[in-house]
């Protein structure tokens, strides 16, 4: 059996047993999603790359402590999110610090929902603009709310799995999502974007928080 033929748990066990290729294969399988979580949680590529590196070092060293009471992917995401939150706390990042320097180009000055009647953007341009505004607003949320929304709304994980990743109760995840969505909705109204919310704390329709078009994977 080759390294590529093994499932995640077998790769992790092989890594613990000394297989030099196993962890690299495991990371390669989940690289894009782990990077997406880090990028959306941190708000910029440089900090996301640092947080992901912290997480991978931690996972590499702590693989022997994996108890098997969750999926390996859940365990990896939990380590990545914790690394992001630790770095945010260490850097004392304020809510607005993760906003891009060119935010005004994304959301404009004052009211932003007016579209020129002379030159109407095509659907792709409108979708890109909307996505940028959502991600900019997301970056202003408190770290715990941001992490919950990234995992539930953008990555599509069930609330129960996110509770494991964040090491908190299911009700806490739902509460963080609900508070985050309310704050996000208020910001998006200012930005001229309609935000869909749900009452039960579970994932809203995909259009509510669109995926990022940022390059996949951490910078090489």
Stretch-by-stretch model annotation:
Residues 26, 30, 34, 55, ...:
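Residue-level preference for hydrophobic side chains embedded in well-ordered alpha helices
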Residues 16-17, 40-44, 54-71, 90-92:
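Sigma70-family region 2
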Residues 61-68, 78-99, 108, 127, ...:
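Arg/Lys-rich amphipathic alpha helix in sigma70-family domain 2
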Residues 2-3, 16-25, 35-54:
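Short, charged helix-capping/linker segments at alpha-helix termini
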Residues 94-121:
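Charged, low-cysteine interdomain linkers and short loop/connector segments
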Residues 2-4, 14, 102, 109, ...:
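C-terminal edge and immediately downstream basic/flexible tail or linker adjoining helix-turn-helix-like DNA-binding
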Residues 135-147, 151, 155-172:
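Helix-turn-helix DNA-binding module
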Residues 29-32, 40-43, 150-158:
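Short helix-capping/turn signature of helix-turn-helix
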